[in-house]
Amino acid sequence: MNQVRLAADSSCDLLTLSGMDFVSVPLTIRTETEEFRDDAALDVDGMVRALRDTNGRSYSACPNVADWEGAFGGCGDVIAFTITSGLSGSYGVACAAKESCEERDPSRRIQVFDSLSAGPEIALLIEKAAAELRAGTNFDTVCNVLKSYQSQTHLLFALESMHNLAQNGRVSKLAATVAGVLGIRVVGQASAEGTLEMLGKCRGARRTLECLLRAMERLGYRGGRVRIGHCQNEVLAQDFCSELLHLFPQADIKSYPLRGLCSYYAERGGIMLGFEA
C-alpha cells in the first residue's frame, strides 16, 4: 500500500480511518460566550443543546495555517479534503499550508480538494481515496480518480430547524421561525458551486423520505454507495436506510451520528446524505 497521508477538516465526521494514516483537522463553532472545538473530546449533544438556547450570533471558524501544516506533517505525500469553500475558508487556508510545506520541501506532493460539499459526501471521497491507496494506486492516479469521482457524488440534506443558519446570517430569521412554527422540514442539496441550494419544503417524516428519494433519482442514483449522517435522529436515518435497501438490496448504505461542524448546520433532527450517482 502506498504510504500517503489522508487529511480532512472535521466536516468529514471522521476521527480515524482503519488501516490508514489519517488526520482530522478540527473546525471550531463559536457563540458570543462559548467555543466548541470539533475534535474527539467534543460533547456533540451538549453543543447542540447549548446552541438551541443561543439567541446571539453563532458561527464556524476554520483551522489556521499552522493546524493544516501540523496535519500535513514534516514529510511525505498528502491528499487533503476540506468543507466547501462556499461555507468556509478552510480550503484557502489548507492551500496556503500546502504552499508553505512544498516550499520547505519541494519533493513533497500535497493535493487539496475543495469538496464543494460537507459531511457524508466528503466521507465518500475519503473512502474512495483509501480504497485506491490500499490497491496500490500511485499518488497522481489517485488524485485523477478522485477528480473524476467527485463529479459522480452528491449531497442532500433535510433540516427540522434553521436556527443556527439564521443566527449566522445564511437564512432570514423570519424564514427560520416560520418553518419551526409550522413544522416544515427544508430539503436541499450542495450545488455544483458548493453553496446550499433549497429544493423544497415538506411536513412529516414520510414526506421527507419521499422528497429525498425523488431528489436522489433526479440526480441519477441507481444503487451506489450511500452515507447518511444524522443529528439526534437515528430513527429517520434508519427508516431511510430501510427504504433504500428495499429498493436497492445490494446497495452499500451506512448511517452514523454527525460530529460537531455538521451537527451545527444540520441541527437537531437534521440528516445529511452523500451518495454515488
Regions found by a protein language model. Give the residues of each.
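Generic enzyme active-site microenvironment
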Residues: A7
